[in-house]
Amino acid sequence: IDPLSRLFVGFISLLFFICALYAPSYLRLRFERDNRILVSCLLIVLGMMSLVTLSHHLGLMWIAMEATTLVTAPCVYFNRNPKSLEASWKYLLIGSVGIALALLGSFFLVYAMVQAGSESTLMFDELIEHSHLLSRPWLHAAFVLLLVGYGTKMGLSPMHTWKPDAYGEAPGMVGALLAGGLTSCAFLCVLRFFHIEHIAHGGRHAQG
């Protein structure tokens, strides 16, 4: 585990701890709603966010990010009314588009290794080690797709339209986890790929 992972997993753990302190009183007030699905989904979200922060595997990190999208959608629908249904579907659809772009960017990054004549890999450490060999056009295309894809999960403009509805309809603790936890995980993904891009350019300049 690297220092960046420790920082993010520590922040997410603290965020979940604070939400866990708030959750019992909130759920007692909302006793008319069955909270078993909400609590189960939140526990899975904690596991998936932790996996994102600790993973050094490109594919595993993407799977964990996709899982957070699927598992948090029922949390947005907690109120079970037409507005929360619309918000959850908007969140799910826009988030899925973003994560699909991130998957395409991941494919491009692996293909950049193949184009450079290197063995394809999904491990970040190996990608960083061989980043100076990556095919520059495919590397740039991969970074743009990954930035847009994971930027959608962060709610960056213009793919931010899901945020007002999702934050407005979700319970307060779910909104906090979306704003603090999910955004942080997506930002970490962008940082991982930015590191590869930065090292790739640094290696080329050093060789030049």
Give the label of every model feature segment:
Residues 44, 141-144, 174:
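Alpha-helical membrane-protein architecture signal
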Residues 11, 93, 144-151, 177-181:
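Hydrophobic alpha-helical transmembrane segments of multi-pass membrane proteins
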Residues 1, 101-165, 186-208:
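Juxtamembrane/interfacial segments at transmembrane-helix boundaries in multi-pass membrane proteins
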Residues 173-174, 180-187:
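Loop-to-transmembrane helix boundary motifs in multi-pass membrane proteins
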Residues 3-100, 171, 180, 206-208:
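Internal transmembrane alpha-helices of multipass membrane proteins
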